[in-house]
Amino acid sequence: WVIGKADSTKSKTRKTKPIWAGIELGVNSYLDNKGDFNLADGKENFELKLNKSVSFSLNFLQKNVQLGHSNVWFFTGLGVTWNNYRFDDDIKLSNGNFTNAYHDTTAGVSHQKSKLVASYLTAPIMFEFFTSRKYKNAFHMGVGGTVGLLIGSHTKNKVEIDGETKKLKDFGDFNLNPFRYGFRVAMGYGRLNVFADYYASTLFKDKKGPVLYPVNVGITLVGL
């Protein structure tokens, strides 16, 4: 290598690598124990407004390992994910021995909006295949899973109390599972990437809340 001369060993075209580090936006939902999005059997109050139930992820660390000289990569990393579950009905979540959704009947109090926010430290364990080694014309598909550690949670309610509008936050674990794990599939072309997550762990602890399996679909906006 000589100063002022190009390094001939480096390709002028950026090679492919898995897309994880960056920003993700998604939509949250969940399935009941029958695999149904339409909730019944006492879970109706947990129905969501999908257009308001958004997720945001900031994935700040990524480690790639190419399998030999193939177009297959293994990768892992770290990120922080914020999951917003905006309830279709204006309810409150109990924060006791069992998490339930109920209507507040306190006189003079009118609920207008209600949501649960849960944040996780997230790590992928994925394999990704590319049809080319160049970003601009590479179709890619990834399969694997993600694991997450709960690092914060709260509810947010917009209420009207005696004619005055207030936003109330209640911090607690709401019997959320402290650890989650699930499956991820991802595909895309070039720098564009879409993904879908299904969690095999329930949103709430066993026998501490309704049986709900989180689902998340979205897009990677920036691959760093």
Task: Name what the model sees in each region.
Residues K34-N38, K43-N51, Y85-A118, L150-D162, ...:
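Extracellular/periplasm-exposed beta-strand and loop segments of Gram-negative cell-envelope proteins
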Residues K17-I19, V27-D32, N38-N97:
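Glycine- and aromatic-enriched membrane insertion/assembly motifs of diderm outer-membrane
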Residues W1-N28:
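N-terminal targeting leaders of membrane proteins
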